[in-house]
């Protein structure tokens, strides 16, 4: 019986069932992608970046189609070639009774076209899907330009390595895949149709027909030719070789003098091998390509592996410093350029580490001390929550932020936070879908607290009578209530927050808002009022098509049937500020710490964006991200880069979600390429509002990376670099229970030239595997000097204590140790940010706030940290000893270290959010045992006059600080001292 007789046609009903099943499977696979694609299209339209979505989609589709067609066409050609050149006996079906593949041959022969196309598509589709993810590489190749800098080995512009070479490697990889699959499929097809047979004779184990030999030789020769091209491109990849890591990245002596020549030799051998395969077509002798292949493999082992290893072992290692010095010099220059830590951005200044003058005599030091930050944003989240939460469904992030504001002409740094909606804190009936997504939709207000003072000093911190209303932030609240009352310190026109970090922690994070006029508001605003969203943000869900799409996206039928959704309703989603920026600018890497700011009366999130590249020749490899440990305890791999620029500052409006990208680096070639890919998406620097620019901070992730690199790359001499003797280390965090590196700190310090307050990101550095202080880094955030990094270098034989030594000295002090013993009985102690402050014309002042929190066994108790003490450490000039100050206030601690008078320039506790109190505004400290009796109090008129003169003297001193005139400043300081003496003589309270 013929095969066609054995095969019966399927009934029509069965065919329909098969088609329906296939359609349902396709719908299940493709349907969710279509839903997400459609809702994303709506979202990109809402934020005004639909062109980005379209460009990415079109690029992906073109890549998918091109690679699928390329791989599929080559495979198709291989199958057709093998099928059409099959032996006649296979075509006629003769003498196949004992052929083991006869059954399969018959099946394929019935529908050769279907099988050919099917196999080609089946194998090509996965590679097409994989290729579409490389859209960034293709777009950078099409739009990339020159860096204006050439590499030290080949003399090519850096743009070749960043923009062009990755694309060439991508093309080569696709060709490799296509040819290799074609070779395998051609081999299989020839075997199926008899072009290749297991021979029964003793002379030949395998019989290969001439057409099969020709086809296999062509594809094998092509594959080897591609390998030759790969060897050629591998020469350029040596410029980021990891052979010498961790010493340095890039081609070393062995790479340049052994591996590079070996690559050229391998190119020549591979070309000869490819020619040998092509020659086998005419010569009809497979021994030639076989010997060529053996030569290629043997050469790869000897020339590519053993020879470089011998050079490394017997020539380089015995003379490593001499051999590697020229290449280390290349690495130093390239790394500095790639990470923006070269002499064009970094200023070095030798610094003795020992003070030579009194801080009171230096205007910049007076500014630094007056603005010494006592509030720690990593400690105060629960304090903010307990004192400013208002409702259980509001919340603050675990780590607050630091920014600065000019209030009444005075620049002050503030601990800032947005009072966001916390959906995960909803409880009971609040978690019902209708409440969670249509009633509790937004946060309320911007909270700020001056970072250099608290409301009052805590005196008897260890006693049971410790004040419950002391040691807490002084809040400046800009919310709905303060807006109505008209008493906002930082004016906010729209205090409602629909987009934020805490809001986005919910999954899903969407809210359905808005409604037609005349319909009663539904959203919770205050206890006495509801609200209807009127912003431009959100995707309309009034139509049934959109409601169905979002119901499918979130798997929520209530979106379809809820009566709370009307014709004017909108759905707000993608509410995380950093995620919104990453969506509209997928080519950016965002900083891990967005922060809120009030700009133009609106609350906006400021997000730092980085452009990166992975293959900058000779540049050291680094990572912007902190190490991440998963649930199993394994450290996850981090994205490695070798070029970084903080070229974009983005803002996200907290009310309507508007995303705006601003260019802040006009010399970044990577950003220039992306601006060509997505024209009009990034605003020029001239479009940045002055008020917004005043809130730009030097980004923390970039500073951490640069700090790690500067620990090594401050060294100029390659031989000294090789020995590592002059390296620095990032100090361990002495205040953290789990160890780790000390984080950088934002501080407001006095500018050495003008004495005006300057907002900077700072970090101490210690010697390599030592604990003594070696350097002090500070990055400017002020608009006029933004991005410059100052480095104070201490002598290599310095005995100035580093952060951990200082911490140990302070907590070992007898006063501290004795009180700590009492405190730990009923309190938890938090040692907050240990600030390193250069003062006294060469000295280092350490300031560390100490917070306490009452221990309690009561469930859900409302205890939270309060500032209890201030620790101060300073190296004494001359003797080199360390002076420790420990007191309820910074002023008292400074007076213990520097003597009476220095504390007068510190900011006292109390006052309101805009105005600190006069220097005498602190409660009196209890007299020490055995002290002489206090003098009789002065008259009220004398004390009033003394306070008035003291305030006038302080005002005069602040004015003198801003003039930069040292003579005027000295006179103002003398007047202040006289006023202090008069005030004390009149019975005023000392610090």
Swiss-Prot record:
Family to which the UniProt record says this protein belongs: Belongs to the UPF0182 family.
Compositionally skewed regions (Pro residues) per UniProt: 915-938
Organism of derivation: Rhodococcus jostii (strain RHA1)
Superkingdom per UniProt: Bacteria
Transmembrane segments: 16-36, 61-81, 115-135, 170-190, 214-234, 263-283, 291-311
Bias (Low complexity) ranges: 903-914
Pfam families in the record: UPF0182
Entry's Gene Ontology cellular component terms: extracellular region; plasma membrane
Matches recorded under NCBIfam families: PRK00068.1 (NF000825), PRK12438.1 (NF009097)
Keyword DNA-binding annotated: no
Its membrane topology: Multi-pass membrane protein
InterPro entries: UPF0182
Annotated spans, Disordered: 902-940
Cellular compartments annotated: Cell membrane
Keywords on record: Cell membrane, Membrane, Plasmid, Transmembrane, Transmembrane helix
The name this protein goes by in its record: UPF0182 protein RHA1_ro08670
């Amino acid at each position: 019986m013929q095969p066609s007789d054995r095969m019966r046609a399927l009934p029509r009903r069965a065919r329909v069932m098969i088609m329906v099943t296939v359609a349902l499977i396709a719908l299940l696979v493709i349907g969710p992608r279509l839903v997400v694609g459609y809702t994303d299209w709506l979202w990109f339209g809402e934020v005004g970046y639909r062109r980005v979505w379209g460009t990415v989609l079109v690029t992906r589709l073109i890549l998918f189609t091109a690679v699928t067609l390329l791989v599929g066409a080559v495979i198709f050609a291989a199958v057709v070639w093998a099928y059409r050149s099959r032996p006649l006996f296979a075509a006629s079906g003769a003498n196949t009774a004992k052929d083991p593949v006869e059954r399969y041959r018959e099946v394929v022969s019935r529908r050769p076209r279907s099988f050919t196309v099917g196999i080609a598509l089946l194998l090509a589709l996965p590679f097409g899907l994989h290729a579409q993810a490389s859209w960034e590489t293709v777009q950078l190749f099409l739009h990339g330009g020159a860096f204006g800098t050439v590499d030290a080995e080949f003399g090519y512009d850096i743009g070749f390595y960043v923009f062009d070479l990755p694309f060439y490697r991508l093309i080569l990889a696709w060709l490799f895949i296509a040819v290799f699959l074609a070779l395998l499929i051609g081999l299989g097809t020839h075997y199926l149709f008899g072009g290749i047979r297991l021979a029964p004779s003793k002379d030949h184990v395998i019989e290969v027909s001439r057409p099969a030999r020709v086809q296999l030789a062509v594809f094998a020769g092509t594959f080897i030719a591609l390998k030759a091209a790969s060897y050629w491109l591998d020469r350029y990849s040596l410029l980021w070789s990891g052979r010498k890591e961790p010493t340095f990245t890039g081609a070393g002596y062995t790479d340049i003098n052994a591996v590079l020549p070996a690559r050229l030799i391998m190119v020549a051998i591979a070309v000869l091998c490819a020619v040998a395969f092509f020659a086998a077509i005419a010569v009809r002798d497979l021994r030639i390509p076989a010997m060529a292949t053996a030569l290629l493999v043997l050469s790869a082992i000897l020339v590519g592996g053993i020879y470089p290893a011998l050079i490394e072992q017997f020539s380089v290692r015995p003379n490593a410093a001499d051999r590697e010095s020229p290449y280390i010099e290349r690495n130093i220059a390239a790394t500095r350029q790639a990470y923006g830590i070269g002499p064009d951005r970094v200023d070095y200044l030798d610094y003795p580490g020992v003070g030579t003058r009194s801080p009171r005599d230096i205007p910049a030091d007076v500014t630094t001390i007056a603005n010494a930050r006592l509030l720690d944003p990593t400690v105060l989240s629960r304090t903010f929550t307990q004192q400013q939460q208002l409702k259980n469904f509001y919340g603050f992030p675990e780590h607050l932020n630091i920014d600065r504001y000019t209030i009444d002409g005075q620049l002050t740094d503030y601990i800032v936070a947005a009072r966001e909606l916390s959906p995960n804190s909803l409880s009971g009936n609040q978690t019902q879908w209708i409440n969670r997504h249509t009633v509790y939709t937004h946060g309320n207000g911007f909270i700020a607290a001056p970072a250099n003072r608290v409301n009052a000093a805590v005196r008897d911190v260890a006693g049971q009578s410790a004040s419950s209303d002391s040691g807490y932030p002084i809040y400046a609240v800009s919310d709905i209530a303060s807006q109505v009352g008209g008493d906002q310190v930082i004016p906010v026109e729209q205090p409602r927050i629909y987009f934020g970090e805490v809001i986005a922690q919910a999954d899903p994070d969407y809210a359905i808002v808005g409604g037609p006029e005349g319909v009663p508001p539904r959203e919770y605003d205050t206890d006495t009022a509801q609200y209807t969203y009127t912003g431009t943000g959100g995707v309309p869900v009034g139509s049934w098509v959109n409601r169905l799409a979002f119901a499918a996206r979130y798997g929520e039928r209530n979106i379809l049937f809820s009566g709370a959704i009307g014709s004017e309703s909108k759905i707000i989603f993608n509410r995380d500020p950093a995620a919104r920026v990453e969506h509209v600018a997928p080519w950016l890497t965002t900083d891990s710490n967005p922060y809120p700011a009030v700009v133009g009366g609106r609350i906006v999130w400021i997000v730092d964006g980085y452009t990166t590249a992975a293959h900058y020749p000779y540049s050291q490899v680094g990572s912007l991200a902190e190490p991440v440990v998963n649930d199993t305890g394994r450290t996850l791999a981090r994205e490695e880069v070798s070029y970084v620029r903080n070229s974009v500052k983005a803002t996200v409006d907290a009310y309507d979600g508007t995303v705006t990208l601003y260019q802040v680096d006009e010399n970044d070639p990577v950003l220039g390429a992306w601006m060509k890919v997505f024209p009009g998406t990034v605003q020029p620097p001239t479009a940045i509002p002055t008020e917004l620019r005043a809130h730009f901070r030097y980004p923390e992730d970039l500073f951490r990376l640069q700090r790690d690199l500067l620990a090594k790359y401050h060294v100029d001499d390659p031989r000294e670099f090789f020995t590592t003797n002059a390296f620095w280390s990032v100090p361990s965090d002495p205040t953290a229970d789990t160890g780790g590196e000390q984080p950088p700190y934002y501080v407001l310090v006095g500018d050495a030239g003008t004495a005006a307050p300057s907002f900077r990101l700072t970090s101490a550095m210690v010697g390599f595997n030592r604990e003594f202080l070696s350097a002090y880094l500070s990055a400017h955030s002020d608009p006029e000097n933004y991005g410059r990094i100052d480095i104070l270098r201490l002598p290599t034989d310095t005995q100035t204590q580093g952060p951990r030594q200082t911490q140990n000295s302070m907590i070992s002090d007898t006063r501290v140790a004795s009180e700590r013993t009492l405190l730990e009985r009923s309190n938890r102690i938090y040692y907050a940010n240990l600030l390193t402050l250069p003062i006294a014309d060469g000295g280092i002042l350490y300031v560390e706030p100490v917070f306490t929190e009452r221990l309690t066994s009561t469930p859900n108790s409302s205890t939270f940290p309060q500032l209890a003490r201030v620790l101060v450490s300073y190296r004494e000039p001359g003797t080199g000893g360390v002076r420790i100050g420990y007191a309820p206030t910074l002023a008292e601690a400074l007076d213990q270290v520097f003597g009476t008078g220095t504390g007068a320039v510190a900011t006292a506790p109390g006052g309101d959010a805009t105005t600190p109190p006069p220097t005498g505004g602190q409660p009196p400290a209890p007299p020490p045992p055995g002290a002489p009796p206090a003098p009789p109090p002065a008259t009220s008129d004398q004390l009033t006059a003394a306070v008035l003169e003291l305030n006038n003297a302080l005002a005069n001193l602040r004015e003198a600080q801003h003039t930069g005139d040292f003579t005027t400043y000295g006179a103002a300081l003398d007047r202040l001292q006289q006023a202090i003496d008069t005030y004390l003589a009149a019975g005023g309270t000392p610090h």
